[in-house]
Amino acid sequence: MIDPAGVDQGDAAMSYATEVRRRLYAGERVYGTMAFEFFTPGLIPLLHAAGCEYVVLDMEHSGVSIETIKQQIAYARGLDVAVWVRVPELRYAAVARVLDAGADGVMVPMLETAEQAKDLVRFARYRPDGERGCAFGMAHDHYRPGDPAAVMQSANQRIVLIALIETVKGIENCAAIMAAPGLDVGWLGHYDLTNDQGITGQFDHPRFVAAAERLAEACRVAGKTAASLDASLDFLRAQAARGYRLLGYGQDIAVLRAGYSQGLRALRDFA
C-alpha cells in the first residue's frame, strides 16, 4: 500500500513534495496557485518566494507543450515547492509523460466515475499500487543512477493524484471517486460545475453550495483532501469553512490583471 508518511529517498526538493503529501493526510492546510499563461524561467521561483507551497501547471486550457512543462519543472529544482500538472485528458501517455518529466502530481479534468479514478491511479503509480511504466535515470529522478525499487517507492510516496470534479455526474459519484485507493485530492471545478448545473458563476446558489458541501464530505469520509482555487478571497473563505484544505489563490492571469488594475486605479486618483 502507499504510505503517505514514508521517507523519500530523493533530494530536498523531492522530500518537500513528499512532505506536502504527508501534510494533506495529516489534515493540514496547504496553499498555492495555478499557472495558465506566464511560463517564464522566473515563474515558479517567484511564486515560491511569494509563499506558494504548490503550483499547478495547466495543460488543458493553456496549450503549452510537454517541453515547456519539463522546463518549468527544471526551474523548480531545489525549491521547497511541489509542482503538479493538469493534463488535458485521462490517457496513460498524458499522465506518464508529465510524471517522467518530473511532476510531483497530476490533476485530471472532468473526472466523473470511480473507474476513471482507478485508471488515474493505475497510470500514475508504480507497482504494486499501479502499472506505470519504468524509465529510470531520467528527469523524474534527476538523471541519477539508483536502486529502481527505491525510486518507485519514493515516487509512490511523493506523487499527489487529483480528481478535478466539475460536472453534475462527478458530484453524484464523488463518494465512490474519493474512495478509490491511491487517489489523494478531490478538486472542485466550480465554474464548469455551475455551468453544467445551468447556473454559471452563481456560487451562492443553493445547488452549488450543496454540491460543494457534498464533495467536502466525500473527501472527509474517505480520508482525502478537498481542494478549491479562485482569485476571490470571499469564495475561498467560504470553501475553507466547508472543509476545503488545499486552497489556491489565482490563477496567474487573474492575479496579474487584478494587481495592475488596482495599482493603476490608485495612480489615477492622484496623478
Regions found by a protein language model. Give the residues of each.
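Alpha-helix-loop-beta-strand connector modules within alpha/beta enzyme cores
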Residues: 66-87, 92, 96, 125-129, ...
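Conserved anion-binding
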Residues: 93, 105-181, 190-195
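Glycine-rich phosphate-binding active-site loops on the catalytic face of alpha/beta enzymes
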Residues: 107-116, 187-195, 245-262
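N-terminal amphipathic alpha-helix/helix-capping segment at the start of soluble metabolic enzymes
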Residues: 10-34, 146-157
